[in-house]
């Protein structure tokens, strides 16, 4: 009897589903009704993941996300964890001091920041001691990886 191999990670599951039914729906945005297929999510997370790897940060490093829920934040979270990094979604109602503690304690190397959150994150970053790079995150278009 053959033992069935199941995907062990989120990334493996997306690759598997993309290879079996690329057009199947992975995500539907309740705000925009935009649908993302398994094929699209696979292509997008591979592209984002490759850019993260090219930055030279070590796998296992923390990368924070400061964004309201959106299609882009879902794709970014999935790309981060699928590429071997630790995703740190920031609680945007926690206040600057708690965010500063979270950013410093997590040792985040980057924070992907939606425009609506930029003032809050700038305030939090100014309260902590570690160096962290901010990258723009458009809720529809995704991260600004060329910045």
Regions found by a protein language model. Give the residues of each.
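A short N-terminal helical cap/helix-turn-helix that marks the beginning
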Residues: 3-26, 43
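Structural core segment of the AMP-binding/adenylate-forming
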Residues: 54-55, 82-147
């Amino acid at each position: 009897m053959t033992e069935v191999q199941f995907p062990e990670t989120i990334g493996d599951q997306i690759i598997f589903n993309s290879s079996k039914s690329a057009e199947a729906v992975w995500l539907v945005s309740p705000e925009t009704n935009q649908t993302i297929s398994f094929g699209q999510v696979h292509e997008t997370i591979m592209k984002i993941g490759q850019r993260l790897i090219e930055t030279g940060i070590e796998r296992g490093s923390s990368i924070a996300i400061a964004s309201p829920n959106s299609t882009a934040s879902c794709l970014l979270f999935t790309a981060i964890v699928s590429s071997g990094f630790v995703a740190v979604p920031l609680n945007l109602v926690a206040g600057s001091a708690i965010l500063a503690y979270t950013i410093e304690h997590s040792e985040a190397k980057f924070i992907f920041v939606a425009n609506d959150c930029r003032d809050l994150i700038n305030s939090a970053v100014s309260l902590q001691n570690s160096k962290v790079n901010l990258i723009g995150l458009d809720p529809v278009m995704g991260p600004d990886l060329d910045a």
